[in-house]
């Protein structure tokens, strides 16, 4: 769950490290829906994501905030403002990242996804 989440977050993150949760959620759902549409495994057999549950944005949002987001929040890499509907990257971490760093992170996530599903 971490790789699709991170890719979605990075794609929607603005210059101050914020991303609207609804935008991240849309891409996160689209990743798994695309796998279902192509007849590919979504994840492990115990994964709750299927054609029906992916239509329930509230459930998927809750799932996404529990795992994988919570893992990043626990390490204080990210935080979520429910009132603003925004997921934010820790500003100290953001300040250390260059555009090249973000490209390397995205490339690594894509490579890891390929390996994960092999």
Predicted regions and their residues:
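Intrinsically disordered, charged low-complexity linkers and terminal tails
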Residues: 1-118
């Amino acid at each position: 769950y971490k790789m699709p989440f991170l890719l979605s977050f990075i794609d929607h993150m603005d210059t101050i490290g914020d991303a609207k949760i609804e935008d991240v959620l849309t891409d996160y759902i689209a990743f798994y829906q695309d796998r279902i549409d192509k007849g590919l495994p979504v994840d492990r057999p115990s994964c709750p994501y299927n054609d029906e549950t992916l239509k329930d944005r509230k459930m998927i949002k809750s799932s996404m905030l529990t795992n994988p987001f919570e893992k990043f929040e626990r390490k204080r890499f990210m935080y979520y403002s429910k009132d603003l509907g925004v997921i934010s990257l820790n500003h100290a971490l953001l300040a250390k990242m260059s555009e090249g760093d973000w490209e390397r992170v995205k490339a690594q996530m894509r490579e890891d996804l390929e390996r994960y599903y092999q």
